[in-house]
Amino acid sequence: MQKDFIFTSESVSEGHPDKMADQVSDAVLDAILTQDKHARVACETLLTTGLCVIAGEITTTAVIDYNQIARQTIKRIGYDSSDIGFDYNTCSVLVTVGKQSPDIAQGVDRAHDDYLDQGAGDQGLMFGYACNETPVLMPMPIHLAHRLTERQSELRKDGRLPWLRPDAKSQVSIRYVDGKPHSIDTVVLSTQHDPEVSHAQLSEAVIEEIIKPVLPKDMLSADTRYLVNPTGRFVVGGPMGDAGLTGRKIIVDTYGGASPHGGGAFSGKDPSKVDRSAAYAGRYVAKNIVAAGLADKCMVQVSYAIGVAKPTSLMVDTFGTGKIPEAKIVELIQAHFDLRPKGIVNMLDLLRPIYTRTASYGHFGRDEPEFTWEVTDKAAELKAAAGL
């Protein structure tokens, strides 16, 4: 495996059109779970100039106002005028929602291999990942990229940089030496802005107020490159600049490309969908393995069949950093984690309206209390069971 290289990850702000769509879908999910925690929700959102479309399959006893949920979510993000790309107050909101297929429901509600447990909502494969590059056990490039877009939003909302607009993207390239982060090679930050601000003024403020306060000083050097709005202008943004769709930022949502991805998006899906819940469980497992000192880096793959409760496979890769054999780690996972869909829901307390917060700045590497899959409460027992 190559030891010296440059690795890059990107993030996008809450005002990016795809992330707007994710947040609307998860706001719908949260509103439903508040009233009906056993609802089946698969909610997709499309955003384009002046239009928000909400579609999907939803089976619930909850009664919610889709129109107001969409508008209030877009307002919170900051789109309150067509001049900046979208207006929550004047946009059209179209809702076309059906119910979950009864063929799917019969497999989810009663699993074929264990009548006491809920079956998986679909087939699929999911990955979890953790490494010791950062205190939150996330790869450094994606961790820093998220902090940059968070900082852009913070300075926009508190008025310190009043000419910032909601749409933004970041990209961080880290130089690795002997397989470990050594220095920051390149930082890209593109942010939407008012037309009056000059590129020179914007570039200086972004570097000094957004980028440098976030990045570790010991990772910066005279050779670090800062590329701010490289095209020179970013006035038209949001859904006016690009259409937004739920589920189009799955690498931003996870590990920034440092780990494989099973392909299933998260937002708008209730926890019976293993695309979401099993990916969260995979992160929980991998993070506890690294926190326990069983490996410096750990990837977990799990797979499911629709209507079947037990995973169809479980695989671990520690990339040569494991302190015990990977086969032993698999045994420990099977002994200490219940990876059946209902087991995951119970283990991580997922039947709560916690998902809107996950829909921007990453589903992993967060320390808010809603993110139960980030807790390392299994680390001590894993370490003891491994005999370390």
Swiss-Prot record:
Cofactor(s) it depends on: Mg(2+); K(+)
Renumbered residue ranges of the record's region Flexible loop: 100-110
Positions bound to L-methionine: E57, Q100, D242, K273
GO molecular function: ATP binding; magnesium ion binding; methionine adenosyltransferase activity
Entry GO CC: cytoplasm
UniProt similarity note: Belongs to the AdoMet synthase family.
Identification of the protein by name: S-adenosylmethionine synthase
Organism of derivation: Thiobacillus denitrificans (strain ATCC 25259 / T1)
